[in-house]
Amino acid sequence: MSEQQIDLQHQANVIRKLTLEEIGKLGVGHVGGSLSICEVLAALYFRLMKIDPHNPGWPERDRLVLSKGHGGPALYAALALKGYFPIELLDTLNRPGTMLPSHCDMRRTVGIDMTTGSLGQGFSAAVGMALAVQMDHLPNTIYTIIGDGESDEGQIWEAAMFAGGRRLDHLIAFTDYNKMQIDGYTQEINPLEPLEDKWRAFGWHVQSIDGHNTDEIVSAVEQAKRAQGKPSMILLNTIKGKGASFSEGKLASHNMKLTEEMWKAAVAELEKEGA
């Protein structure tokens, strides 16, 4: 089956199912912020990114920096589904000796382009990669996903100012805008609005879309690639914990315990939908 024939929403649901299984078998993890990014991961890995799972170090590949590194379980699910490593390894999430720590580590996991978890730093690394692409006239596109809670970090805005000033148009960023963070609602903790205007003021091309609609994600990236002379920010309006009744839209889903009954029921629901 060609990449154009792959049902991206189906792939997103499979990623969501695998994510629930790996966190569920461990018993605890970052459920909310992993389940909210399954659609963008499906679009990137199964349609948009120029990558080769059989040659993960390919110099001309596109890169993804998951700056909100606590979403690692979803990224691992996408990588396994794409063929970077066996799906069975997902059962080792965050266990002794694993190659799949709770937060992304480029030295331990094949397919991970940057170690992340200290909020704000991954985004800065992605900006640095995009600068290298520009300076060396390379064909790579650099993608990065940041969190809305992560957007409280001053380092995000320092990097945003630099990227806009340097006109890094090989950089496409996404914000997982689920309106929740570990301490509460983003609007109550540190209001981000007007978020679109903020990014435009820093010299970015900005779009705001449904982050759970794979067609909109693909279209937004295609439009971003046509925006010459500007880095692009795509605000993904998402729901934290999407796809499981015990986590969807719930603040407690940021990092939560899962019983076997909980995660198996959620997986069964996804399987009914064809995952």
UniProtKB/Swiss-Prot annotation:
Its biological purpose: Part of the sulfo-TK pathway, a D-sulfoquinovose degradation pathway that produces 2-hydroxyethane-1-sulfonate (isethionate). Catalyzes two steps of the pathway: the formation of 4-deoxy-4-sulfoerythrose (SE) and xylulose 5-phosphate from 6-deoxy-6-sulfo-D-fructose (SF) and glyceraldehyde 3-phosphate, and the formation of sulfoacetaldehyde (SA) and xylulose 5-phosphate from 4-deoxy-4-sulfo-D-erythrulose (SEu) and glyceraldehyde 3-phosphate.
Organism name: Clostridium sp. (strain MSTE9)
Q: Looking at the record's lineage, which domain of life comes first?
A: Bacteria
Keyword terms, alphabetized:
Carbohydrate metabolism, Thiamine pyrophosphate, Transferase
CDD domains xref list: TPP_TK
- What cofactor is this protein dependent on? thiamine diphosphate
Q: Quick check: keyword S-adenosyl-L-methionine in the entry?
A: no
Q: Which residues form a coiled coil?
A: none
Family in the record? Belongs to the transketolase family.
Alphabetized GO MF terms? transferase activity
Gene transcribed to yield this protein: sqwG
Q: What is its EC number?
A: 2.2.1.15
Name of this protein = 6-deoxy-6-sulfo-D-fructose transketolase subunit SqwG
Catalytic reactions of this protein: 6-deoxy-6-sulfo-D-fructose + D-glyceraldehyde 3-phosphate = 4-deoxy-4-sulfo-D-erythrose + D-xylulose 5-phosphate; 4-deoxy-4-sulfo-D-erythrulose + D-glyceraldehyde 3-phosphate = sulfoacetaldehyde + D-xylulose 5-phosphate
Q: How does the record describe its quaternary structure?
A: Forms a complex with SqwH.
